[in-house]
Amino acid sequence: MPKQKVAILGPGSWGTALAQVLNDNGHEVRLWGNIPEQINEINTRHTNSHYFKDIVLDEAIKATLDLKEALADIDAILFVVPTKVTRLVAKQVAQVLDHKAIVMHASKGLEPGTHERLSTILEEEIPAQLRSEVVVVSGPSHAEETIVRDITLITAASKDITAARYVQTLFSNHYFRLYTNTDVIGVETAGALKNIIAVGAGALHGLGYGDNAKAAVITRGLAEITRLGVKLGADPLTYSGLSGVGDLIVTGTSVHSRNWRAGAALGRGEKLKDIENNMGMVIEGISTTKVAYEIAQELGVYMPITSAIYKSIYEGADIKESILGMMSNEFRSENEWHT
């Protein structure tokens, strides 16, 4: 692939790691953010120490506070901003972008209030003449591992397979590999909903439960993720792939996962506000729990783990009692994931 110019909107941990992947592939990378100190640090010290204390970035990776500068003559745009500001940033892009570009996102969440997936938001806010079909970049990927060039395999999903293949080629190299998919609904819901299950798995750890319990919540969590996703129009096979079970494993079992760590802290009895302040990063699983619970209630989808986490976070229920309460739920067949 010829050298591409790529704007990454959001210089957080994942945005920075993906910037390095693209730079390794010989592409021109521009990181855009709104914190002057962070942008200056990336440009002068070539570090992003809030997320990676010991990593030095290539000097070719540039950062800017100016969105117009970031998007000038760009080939592709990657959104890696928190879910709650995706619409706002998309509106800003639509005002500045003056030519057609590939539009991608690598965030995992559902918009509070509207319950919309992020690709839908980008489609609504960026005119069709300025973008490709949106490509979703998602899968089992800790930024802490990708930044040190550990082997990572994820998914590029789009309704337009040509756009997905472009992104596959753009990112893939000897340590970072993408597979394509056309099931955007499945890939996005898998990426968003697994954060809820990771909170639950972390809570079990914080409460002192062992591997049996954690395996149970991850496996049954996959069942309810699939149940809701299929109701929304997803292909059930997607949930057995990288963006489904793959992402669920990596997020639901690792201390690198902020959602798992948040759940573990909740299990130990810590207050949510204190957890969020101590972590200093967005915990998407917290807001996604509320959105998923509301969707499940509206559509009549059985999601007992999501319900238990919701009641603990938003209704003040004891998290141990909420989780143990699932043990007395109605008996079901294991294969009834679709009901």
Curated annotation (Swiss-Prot):
Pathway assigned to this chain's UniProt record: Membrane lipid metabolism; glycerophospholipid metabolism
Give the main localization category.
cytoplasm
Tell me the compartments it is located in. Cytoplasm
Instruction: Tell me which stretches of the chain form a coiled coil.
Output: none
- EC number(s)? 1.1.1.94
Q: What class of enzyme is it?
A: oxidoreductase
Q: Which family does it belong to?
A: Belongs to the NAD-dependent glycerol-3-phosphate dehydrogenase family.
Task: State the name under which the record lists this protein.
Answer: Glycerol-3-phosphate dehydrogenase [NAD(P)+]
**Gene name of this polypeptide:** gpsA
